């Protein structure tokens, strides 16, 4: 079966030949004795022009087709006599599968992104979101391709977990208990031993802890899947459900980790630019002017590197008045991250060696006993897109840190076993897939790069 993509990519092979196409009406113009249909079949960003003339058996019915109607076209592919396209199909027969209801909400006019979020089940049919979600598909493939080409094993991490990988407690709890009759312990706490799994369980915030177990068997591994955060951050950069790519490398320190992250980012950007030229041209023209310049700057330059302490000094000396005051020990806010990436370095930059008190329990302690071997990658226009660290591989230091943070060792027994049975230096990071999508496309809101966004007070569709 020939697709619209075949016509755009290999049109000369089908020129002056009879072809058959299936698809949806994107636009229709009726000129009384002839008409034009822009047909899109989902295989390509652009649609192909169908010319139908008065001699068509069901000309009147075709002339009255509405946007989103589904049809089958038989005709000849010819060189176009008009401007706007090189090739078009002269229809000999058009079969109508269904004439769409005239109340179809996405007529041929500009709609705001806010409005289209209320029509998430239909918005992939628009030019913008067709481009967004096609790039999302290609980007996901590029990530798998990068890791497979570099001999990483793909691991499926569980969605349901009994531990908190971040130690932050911002998790969605899973339960089958009757909320009107919750079993309680003598001390008044919920008795989760009566629950489905016999213990308290949650949706995962990260696949890292499980992934590390496979790192000890397969050396270099990665997982790619949904993660969940129950934090009330109603911003353009946060979602309650999002996807993360998480690699772990055995016998690699934080410097090897940064090299991997930089190679990955450059690989996936180039892959998408090479394989989605029409979509990326659309984003460059209509979503973010200068997008190509920004992405080529990433491809053609080494990423910056700065320690957290140096970053604080840069921010303090900037002379810029920040909403959140700068001092050593704070967690960098979006405004700080963007200043570093956009105004100071003017390119992606790694920030390393953060204070231990603002990072997760599993990060390796530096010799100063104040900082850990953590790294974040900050990108212009969006801030943090990658967060990672060298992992603490010393059993005593890890358990000491867990006690300091009040974590229950029993919940992490399998994780601690890794430090008892053949511990080894290793490192890993997480790439926020949607953040990368925003950076690649210029889209400004995370809700517009996820098919069905989940945010506080919103779980439609």
Swiss-Prot record:
Homodimer. Belongs to the class-II aminoacyl-tRNA synthetase family. It is found in: Cytoplasm. One of its GO terms (cellular component) is cytoplasm. GO terms for molecular function: asparagine-tRNA ligase activity; ATP binding; nucleic acid binding. Disulfide bonds: none annotated. Its main location: cytoplasm. Transmembrane segments: none annotated. InterPro entries: Aa-tRNA-synt_II, aa-tRNA-synth_II, aa-tRNA-synth_II/BPL/LPL, Asn-tRNA-ligase, Asp/Asn-tRNA-synth_IIb, NA-bd_OB-fold, NA-bd_OB_tRNA. It catalyses: tRNA(Asn) + L-asparagine + ATP = L-asparaginyl-tRNA(Asn) + AMP + diphosphate + H(+). Keywords: Aminoacyl-tRNA synthetase, ATP-binding, Cytoplasm, Ligase, Nucleotide-binding, Protein biosynthesis. NCBIfam families: asnS, PRK03932.1. This is Asparagine--tRNA ligase. It comes from Fusobacterium nucleatum subsp. nucleatum (strain ATCC 25586 / DSM 15643 / BCRC 10681 / CIP 101130 / JCM 8532 / KCTC 2640 / LMG 13131 / VPI 4355). One of its GO terms (biological process) is asparaginyl-tRNA aminoacylation. The gene is asnS. Its EC number is 6.1.1.22.
């Amino acid at each position: 079966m020939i697709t619209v993509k075949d016509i755009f990519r290999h049109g000369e092979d089908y020129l002056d030949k009879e072809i058959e196409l299936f698809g949806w009406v994107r636009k229709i113009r009726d000129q009384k004795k002839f008409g034009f249909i822009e047909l899109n079949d989902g295989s390509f960003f652009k649609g192909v022009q169908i010319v139908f003339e008065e001699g068509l058996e069901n000309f009147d019915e075709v002339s009255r087709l509405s946007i989103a109607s589904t049809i089958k076209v038989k005709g000849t592919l010819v060189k176009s006599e008009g401007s706007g396209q090189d090739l078009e199909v002269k229809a000999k027969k058009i079969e109508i599968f269904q004439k769409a209801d005239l109340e179809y909400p996405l007529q041929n006019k500009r709609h705001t992104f806010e409005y289209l979020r209320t029509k998430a089940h239909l918005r992939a049919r628009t030019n913008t979101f067709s481009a967004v979600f096609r790039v999302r598909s290609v980007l996901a493939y590029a990530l798998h391709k990068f890791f497979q080409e570099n001999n990483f094993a793909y691991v499926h991490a569980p969605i349901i977990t009994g531990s908190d990988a971040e130690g932050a407690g911002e998790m969605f709890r899973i339960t089958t208990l009757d909320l009107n009759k919750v079993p309680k312990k003598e001390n008044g706490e919920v008795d989760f031993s009566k629950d489905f799994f016999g213990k308290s369980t949650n949706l995962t915030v990260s696949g890292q802890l499980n992934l590390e177990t496979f790192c000890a068997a397969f050396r270099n591994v990665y997982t790619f899947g949904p993660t969940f955060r129950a934090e009330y951050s109603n911003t353009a950069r946060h979602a309650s459900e999002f996807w993360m790519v998480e690699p772990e490398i055995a016998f690699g320190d934080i410097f090897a980790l940064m090299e991997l992250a930089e190679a990955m980012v450059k690989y996936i950007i180039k892959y998408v630019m090479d394989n989605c030229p029409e979509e990326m041209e659309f984003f460059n023209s209509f979503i973010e002017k200068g997008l190509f310049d920004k992405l080529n700057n990433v491809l053609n330059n080494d990423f910056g590197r700065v320690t957290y302490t140096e970053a604080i000094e840069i921010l303090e000396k900037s002379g810029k008045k920040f909403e959140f005051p700068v001092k050593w020990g704070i967690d960098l806010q979006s405004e700080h991250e963007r200043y570093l990436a956009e105004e100071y370095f003017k390119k992606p930059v790694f920030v390393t060696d953060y204070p231990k008190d603002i990072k997760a329990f599993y990060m390796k302690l530096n010799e100063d006993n104040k900082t850990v071997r953590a790294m974040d990658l900050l990108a212009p226009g969006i801030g943090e897109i990658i967060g990672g660290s060298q992992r603490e591989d010393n059993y005593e230091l890890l358990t000491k840190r867990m006690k300091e943070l009040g974590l229950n060792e029993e919940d992490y027994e399998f994780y601690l076993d890794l430090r008892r049975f053949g511990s080894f230096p290793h490192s890993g990071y997480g790439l926020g897939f949607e953040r990368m999508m925003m950076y690649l496309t210029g889209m400004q809101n995370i809700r517009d790069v996820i098919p069905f966004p989940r945010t506080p007070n919103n779980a439609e569709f």
